[in-house]
Amino acid sequence: MKINLHTIKIAEVVADYVDSDEKGVSGYGGKLNIRPAYQREFIYGEKERNAVIDTIFAGFPLNVMYWVKNADGTFEVLDGQQRTISLCSYHAGEFMHVIDGSLRGWANLTDVQKKKFLDYELQVYICEGTPDEILKWFRIINIAG
């Protein structure tokens, strides 16, 4: 299996974010399946979701994510689904968060705050391999972290 580290800005990940029963959950310009079939449908609670947003605005490193690159050039989230959904749903205005002492949704952020969020670089390992290799890697990273 081939695994390469990439830096991808949040702006790229949240592009064309969709979360619907019909179309599933996708982002990255429609090229990223955020909730593939092997992923659970668990969504972070408010505390965990807010910790993701705090991490971004504090400029701290967010845990690495793993994506699978498919033969057709699309991607699937192998690990990092809840973090990705938290970022996308905040950008979509689906919840508010305390930033700089004030409760703010995406629409209430200053241009500087929006730029900081969108320019944040995520560390993403992109994996290519057979379905068996990908499933084995999924099991390993979900046990070993």
Tell me the role of every PLM-derived stretch.
Residues 3-16, 36-145:
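Basic- and aromatic-enriched surface patches that contact anionic nucleotides/nucleic acids
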Residues 22-27, 107-111:
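Membrane-targeting and insertion segments and their boundary/processing signals
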Residues 13-25:
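C-terminal active-site-capping segments
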